[in-house]
A protein has these predicted regions:
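Repeated loop/turn-to-beta-strand initiation elements of outer-membrane beta-barrel proteins
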Residues: 32-34, 116-120, 162-171
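Flexible, small/polar- and glycine-enriched "cap/hinge" segments at structural transition points
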Residues: 125-127, 132, 157, 161, ...
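C-terminal outer-membrane beta-barrel translocator/porin domains of Gram-negative envelope proteins
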Residues: 1-112, 123-126, 130-133, 137-142
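Strand-loop-strand
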Residues: 136-164
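Outer-membrane beta-barrel "beta-signal"
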Residues: 162-166, 192-205
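Membrane-embedded beta-strand positions of outer-membrane beta-barrel proteins
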Residues: 41-43, 108, 120-124, 160, ...
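Residue-level signature of outer-membrane beta-barrel architecture
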Residues: 27-29, 110-112, 162-164, 173-175, ...
Length: 205
C-alpha cells in the first residue's frame, strides 16, 4: 500500500523511472595507397540505473549482446548476461531474457578494397552484458564482478562489403573463440567449424 501511494503517476498511469549513460568511442586510421585501407576500432560502455517507480530498467531499454552490430561470432541476444548459458532450449526460444543493465564491448576491423565496389574485412569482437544486481533466475551468473574480463564473449571473422556510393550491404562470417557460457577453464573454445553468418545494412562502427 505504502509503495503504491508513493509511486509517481502521469495522467493516472504509473511510469518507469530510469537513467542511461553510454560512451561510444570510435577511431579510424586510413593508410596505404590513396588511403584505401583502414583500421577501425570501437569501445562501448553502457550503464542503466532504475530508481523511483522502477526496480529494473524497462526491458526495451536494456542492453543485449551478439548480432551484426555487436559481437558477431554470437547470434543476436544469445550472449550473456554474464556467464549464464541457456541449457534448456536448443532453439534460442528464451533469448528475450538475455539482457542486462551493463554492456561492455570492443571491436577492431581491418578494411581493404577488393575490386570495384567490393570490399573485404578481417575483424575481432569482444563483449557481454551483465546486471548490477544478480537475478535469482540466473543463479547469480549474470552479476557484474571484477572478473568481467574472463566473462567476455570473443570471436573473429572475415567480411564482404558491397559499397555503392556509401550504401553498404555487409556480410560477416564469424566464429567464437571464447565463450563465457562454458565452465571456467573451458571457455577458450575455437569453434571455427560452427561460424555465424551476419547480414546487415551499413557498417557496425
Amino acid at each position: 500500500e505504502s509503495s503504491t501511494s508513493a509511486s509517481k503517476e502521469f495522467l493516472g498511469l504509473e511510469y518507469a523511472q530510469y537513467a542511461k549513460a553510454d560512451v561510444d568511442f570510435r577511431y579510424h586510421f586510413n593508410f596505404g595507397r590513396n588511403k584505401e585501407q583502414k583500421i577501425a576500432t570501437r569501445l562501448f560502455a553502457g550503464y542503466g540505473l532504475a530508481y523511483g517507480n522502477s526496480d529494473v530498467v524497462p526491458f526495451v531499454k536494456q542492453y543485449f549482446s551478439g548480432g551484426p552490430y555487436s559481437v558477431r561470432a554470437f547470434n543476436i541476444r544469445s550472449l550473456g548476461p554474464g556467464t549464464y548459458a541457456d541449457t534448456t532450449s536448443e532453439d534460442n526460444s528464451s533469448f528475450f531474457d538475455r539482457t542486462g543493465n551493463i554492456r561492455l564491448e570492443a571491436n577492431i576491423e581491418y578494411r581493404f578494397p577488393i575490386y570495384s565496389f567490393f570490399k573485404g574485412a578481417v575483424f575481432a569482437d569482444a563483449g557481454n552484458v551483465w546486471n548490477s544486481v544478480g537475478n535469482p533466475s540466473f543463479n547469480g551468473q549474470d552479476k557484474f564482478t571484477s572478473n568481467f574480463i574472463n566473462e567476455l564473449g570473443m570471436g573473429a571473422g572475415v567480411g564482404l562489403r558491397i559499397d555503392v556510393q556509401g550504401f553498404v550491404i555487409r556480410f560477416d562470417l564469424a566464429a567464437p573463440f571464447h565463450d563465457p557460457g562454458l565452465p571456467e577453464g573451458e571457455r577458450l573454445d575455437f569453434r571455427f567449424d560452427d561460424p555465424v553468418l551476419n547480414f546487415a545494412i551499413g557498417y557496425s562502427f
